[in-house]
Amino acid sequence: MFHRHRRPSFKARVNVPMVTETRDRLALEVRMAGESLIGHPSIDAYNVLSKMLAALERAGMSTVLLHPGTRVMNTICDRYEENGSISVAPEEALRLRQVTAAIDASLHRIPLQRFALAVAEVETFAVVVDPTTSKE
């Protein structure tokens, strides 16, 4: 009787580290999202940085690093709801720069597949709750 050779099953839970090139590109994207919100405040710039912070938290980045940025983003959002415009105060700009620098220094700790999954989950959530997208 023949026995089929079984291949070892793929273990998706293995933590694949982020390669330097990927980490550097992501660090640049995070810093540029922060600078974009600071330099040219807009709803789009706010949403880009907000989704990045959400994905990083979902991927397991320390909330101690992310919490100051989340507080600033909440303050910006509250101000937008009060007066209808996105603006970033100088002390908020400083705090956002500090947070993006801390994120930059910590990105190497996040496994690549965990980050990729977190980005997909945040993007899916954003599409589901976005009132501007309509199905025709």
Question: What residue ranges belong to the model's regions?
Answer:
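Short terminal alpha-helical segments
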Residues: 5-60
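A ubiquitous short alpha-helical element
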Residues: 14, 61-62, 81-86
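Short, low-complexity cationic-aromatic patches
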Residues: 33-47, 82-101
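Generic secondary-structure transition motif, activating predominantly at the C-termini of alpha-helices
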Residues: 34, 77, 81, 104, ...
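Extended intrinsically disordered, low-complexity coil regions enriched in Ser, Thr, Gly, Ala
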Residues: 47-76, 105-120
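Amphipathic alpha-helical binding modules
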Residues: 87-136
